[in-house]
UniProtKB/Swiss-Prot annotation:
PANTHER family: AMINOTRANSFERASE. It comes from Chlamydia abortus (strain DSM 27085 / S26/3) (Chlamydophila abortus). The gene is dapL. It holds the Pfam family Aminotran_1_2. Substrate binds at Y14, G41, K105, Y128, N174, N275, R368. HAMAP family: DapL_aminotrans_1. Pathway: Amino-acid biosynthesis; L-lysine biosynthesis via DAP pathway; LL-2,6-diaminopimelate from (S)-tetrahydrodipicolinate (aminotransferase route): step 1/1. Its EC number is 2.6.1.83. Pyridoxal 5'-phosphate binds at Y71, A104, K105, Y128, N174, Y205, S233, F234, S235, R244, N275. This is LL-diaminopimelate aminotransferase.
Length: 398
């Protein structure tokens, strides 16, 4: 059998697996070094007791012949869909438009698969690598990278001479940690409706938004129901990174150019390819949603982020984002070349970061810091960063 040629279009290594390999190699060479990993956005705050209690009860039911149940509904437990509609969307989205999944990554893949090959995809530059990789794997015809720079306040420059099928937008953004305001999202929604495009809106970090003037969902914007699909996740907010649970919204108003509803095909795809998420996980999520918006984990990560921001600025770095998101986008002085920036932080500070260029060409000259670690690690990293100004450091000969 011939290989799927789409794989030949991918980078040899996924960004974060390459970072892990570099960290492991450094540890072998320097076993005495204490490395603080602020690169990958993994979580550190434990599950809430109410979530654990509900999960345990649900598992015990599966061990009792009287309460055992097998397959659950493919589209998600009705009680969880209703809870999400109430808490996150305040009735703007009906439970029937909410679909429970195992997380945003698989949602993104299924959405691209839903619309099929040959499409033109637009992504923010810099952006989460999964959008481009998934577009390549599913046979997209063209990928347009839209520059998001400090000069544009990290808002994508919308092309006027390109027909876009799927517009990938992440807000709060990974990697820049910045958030699009209502006016910016309205501009994107108006463009999509005028052009017949679909916005794939990644709201995985919406729980970090504390400013009431900022939208937490694309469906806060008038007109979005006819042009957008939203994905979200409990990985960061409830600590479900290893438990796995997310959801997506496909509005009934969203139609193909022939007038057929997209939601019909979406349900058909799920019925064929998916048997639903683990029932105890879904039931524990119902308890978790009741905790919103006052989440201890989010407060923990916000505190970490404030410590990092203060330390980085004290060390004379220019810092963007991190106030409404768990990521800080840090501009690196010109005397540190992009090809050396990961090794610079690893050797000089014993801190692992994510090089900005891994998120796209507009990420050159930047690195991403994650505030999702343990506070004691964040404090130690801040102490190392503030020992000297970055302008007093020298690039090591690596």
């Amino acid at each position: 059998m011939r290989r799927n040629t789409n794989f030949s279009n991918l980078e040899a290594n996924y960004l974060f697996s390459g970072i892990r390999q570099k960290i492991q190699a450094f540890r072998k060479q320097h076993p005495e070094a204490s490395i603080i990993d602020l690169s990958i956005g993994d979580t550190s705050y434990p599950l809430h007791t109410s979530v654990i209690h509900t999960f345990t009860q649900s598992v015990e039911k599966l061990g009792n012949p009287k309460t055992y149940r097998g397959y659950g509904p493919e589209l998600g437990l009705p009680a969880l869909r209703e809870k999400l509609s109430e808490v996150f969307y305040h009735g703007q989205v009906s439970p029937e438009e909410i679909f429970i999944s195992e997380g945003a990554k698989m949602d993104i893949f299924r959405i691209f698969s839903l619309f099929g090959p040959g499409k033109t995809i637009a992504v923010q530059d810099p952006s989460y690598p999964v959008y481009i990789d998934t577009a390549l794997l599913t046979g997209s015809r063209k990928i347009i990278k839209l520059p998001c720079t400090k000069e544009t306040h990290f808002f994508p420059e919308i092309p006027q001479d390109e027909a876009i099928d799927i517009f990938c937008i992440c807000s709060p953004n990974n990697p820049t940690g910045t958030v699009l305001n209502r006016e910016q999202l309205k501009e994107l929604v108006d463009y999509a409706n005028a052009q017949g495009s679909i916005i794939l809106f990644d709201a995985a970090y919406s729980a970090f938004i504390s400013d009431p003037t900022l939208p937490t969902s694309i469906f806060d914007i008038p007109g979005a129901r006819s042009c957008a699909i939203e994905v979200n996740s409990f990985s960061k907010s409830l600590g479900f990174a290893g438990v796995r649970l997310g959801w997506n919204v496909v509005p009934k108003d969203l139609q193909y150019n022939d007038g057929l509803p997209v939601i019909r095909d979406w349900e058909r795809l799920l019925f064929t390819t998916f048997n639903g998420v683990c029932l105890p996980v879904q039931e524990s999520a119902i308890a978790g949603v009741s905790l919103f918006p006052n989440l201890e984990a989010i407060s923990h990560y916000r505190y970490n982020s404030s410590l990092l921001r203060e330390a980085l600025q004290k060390a004379d770095f220019s810092v963007y984002g991190g106030e409404q998101a768990p990521y800080l986008w840090v501009e690196v002085p010109g005397h540190i070349p992009d090809e050396d920036v990961f090794d610079f932080f690893l050797h000089h500070y014993h801190i692992a970061i994510t090089p900005g260029k891994g998120f796209g060409s507009c990420g050159k000259g930047y690195v991403r810091f994650s505030s999702l670690g343990k506070t004691e690690d964040i404090v130690a990293a801040c102490q190392r960063l503030t020992l000297t100004s970055v302008y007093d450091t020298m690039v090591l000969s690596l």
